[in-house]
Amino acid sequence: MTAIRKAGATGNKILLPGNDYTSAGAFISNGSGAALMKVTNLDGSTTNLIFDVHRYLDSDNSGTHMTCTTNNVGDFTNLGKWLRTNKRQAILTETGGGPSDSSCLKAVCEQLDVLNQYSDAYLGWTGWAAGMFASSYELSEVPTKNGNSWTDVPLVTQCIAGKFKK
């Protein structure tokens, strides 16, 4: 932190990942939150120091299964309350589920609704597997080209992009 800030990046946001794959579900209980609360800027403030969390919705939170077994509402509600209490912010930098699986369309949208309810604490989210992933990858969010236009997968349309507050 010191080297980054001393290099002149005083107004830039810096993401602070935790341990245990920076899991939002374990961020408080595994000590990540407590440890990262001690990280400060040169002036002792925590301005622009953002916690970086991940959370998938499959059975083992690995992001390797097409179906979703949880909506993580409890995890993100608890973390959102903790962030508010401690006047801190986080960003969900990895999340996702099966791109057209009905269980994931429901669960991912519900998860992101909670992040919107705590929009003062959560800066946003990033869907995992958007970009140059092979279309055969289980959680691919890569659009398909149809003639001159592109078609997003349902998960992106309904949840990942669809839940951004306007």
Description of each model-found segment:
Residues 1-123, 140-159:
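Extracellular glycoside hydrolase catalytic/binding regions
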Residues 20, 126-134:
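Short, solvent-exposed turn/loop segments enriched in Gly/Ser/Thr/Pro and often Arg
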Residues 137:
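Substrate-binding cleft and catalytic face of glycoside hydrolase catalytic domains
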Residues 159-166:
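C-terminal helix/juxtamembrane-tail motif
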